[in-house]
Amino acid sequence: MTGDVVGGASGNIGGLIGHNFGGNTEYVVARGKVSGGNLSYVGGLVGYNDGDLSSAEASGDVSGGANSFVGGLVGTNGDFVDHRINSASAKGNVVGGSQSSVGGLVGQNNSFITNSLANGQVSGGTYARLGGLVGLNMGDLLNSVAYGNVKFVSNYAQSYGGLVGVN
């Protein structure tokens, strides 16, 4: 899929899928800018993932408003331990508002990420959690890498890391 996606507040916004609700998604590509408002789940491919993603790719800048979960590929990955992202990549700059979780690949991970990579600059507002791969990780990461810059602001009380902002 190629094209830009613009969403409002309190949504699940993805370049290809807004909410992957139990689906098994393989060999998919999304190219284009994706943006969402406050209190949103925003991803270059999937806004909110409650399924499995493999051999998936997203390229393009991704942005979200305050109190959002923003990722180059997926905004939030799963509330259960069996939602996996495998062999996936994201390329592009990812920006979130204040108190957001922002990652080059995934904004918030609650499950598994394996064999994946992110390449792009990550930035956010005050109190944001910024990670080159994952902004807020409460799951498992294996054999994955992040390239690019994590752009923090010293007086913004942010949590940031080259791979993960908060683990």
What does each model-identified segment do?
Residues M1-N167:
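Predominantly extracellular beta-rich ligand-binding scaffolds that present long acidic/polar faces
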